[in-house]
Amino acid sequence: MAAPRVFPLSCAVQQYAWGKMGSNSEVARLLASSDPLAQIAEDKPYAELWMGTHPRGDAKILDNRISQKTLSQWIAENQDSLGSKVKDTFNGNLPFLFKVLSVETPLSIQAHPNKELAEKLHLQAPQHYPDANHKPEMAIALTPFQGLCGFRPVEEIVTFLKKVPEFQFLIGDEAATHLKQTMSHDSQAVASSLQSCFSHLMKSEKKVVVEQLNLLVKRISQQAAAGNNMEDIFGELLLQLHQQYPGDIGCFAIYFLNLLTLKPGEAMFLEANVPHAYLKGDCVECMACSDNTVRAGLTPKFIDVPTLCEMLSYTPSSSKDRLFLPTRSREDPYLSIYDPPVPDFTIMKTEVPGSVTGYKVLALDSASILLMVQGTVIASTPTTQTPIPLQRGGVLFIGANESVSLKLTEPKDLLIFRACCLL
């Protein structure tokens, strides 16, 4: 009998402090519905579900016919399951890490280096940069999902410099004036001026940052108490960030970066060197397998200011331009494909109405990981003897060139996300 190449996984949960608590967390809810024995602690955060082979959260195989305990062990001994191109391109490794995130309090403002810089940083400071890989990532909202992403249009930043004197004070008059003057210039002049402004902010003395932030918080609080709307300078968000990270330089970053609220199904793609921060909500995320992060604020952790200011992409764009749009499949009316301009990963979203009784997950020349977000099915493949029941929160590994038939066991809509590598 052929060894199974499609099998369910038990995946690692990360309980970082910023995660949503207990059953408020989509991560915890997915876990509870896929595993009847799972005990959800209501006083603990459930931040991330990791689906992949990362050493800090290698998925366990739930198939007693398979001798290997973890997905990375199995892939190491079944290399053809990756797909020939994936195996050759990524040295026999699964190139992506697939996740669900449930965010209650903001994550740090950060950017990820490109491959060239990652190699250099890893050599120079392996304690801060643990590998030599780049880390592009994509987030697709499951619930309304708020984040900061990329530099705003310069006109918006200039407006904040006028309306927020504390922000202008930290940037300095010279850099602020220069930014206003370059608004109509070419993109290189704008980028250079923007870099100068951002660097001035990031290199401000801690004491001065705390003073200016306290002035701003006091001003917003007084105006809000008097019944004035302060949303033109994101008053509510600033107070919230300051409460969570008092005196943190990152509180001022909201005046530099686009604020996005993604509706379910909307996505943002974060290429190398783009500053970003997740603020609140639940999402599916996929990324290249790396842990390299250069932080910029909203964090008690190490901030590498010189590297950050040097590496960032200072290309302004509007918030609507930061949305990453999927393409609808021509062959499959239920399938949307989020295919970013990097080779490491692609996400497929499948929405099947409950009135349909069966659905076929097509074979790909790539290993893939499938997550059931909604629905209940029985999965079978031409090579498996035993059908696999899957419900909300269920995770399935699908070897390259394997198709899977799903039989809906309830008349409820299906929502499925599948991470793969389309080379």
Swiss-Prot record:
MF term (GO), any: mannose-6-phosphate isomerase activity
Reactions catalysed: D-mannose 6-phosphate = D-fructose 6-phosphate
Coiled-coil portions: none
Subcellular location: Cytoplasm
InterPro entries referenced in this protein's UniProt entry, alphabetically: Man6P_Isoase-1 (IPR001250), Mannose-6-P_Isomerase (IPR016305), Pmannose_isomerase-type1_CS (IPR018050), PMI_typeI_C (IPR046456), PMI_typeI_cat (IPR046457), PMI_typeI_hel (IPR046458), RmlC-like_jellyroll (IPR014710), RmlC_Cupin_sf (IPR011051)
Family: Belongs to the mannose-6-phosphate isomerase type 1 family.
Name recorded for this polypeptide: Mannose-6-phosphate isomerase
Organism this protein belongs to: Pan troglodytes (Chimpanzee)
Organism taxonomic ancestry: Eukaryota, Metazoa, Chordata, Craniata, Vertebrata
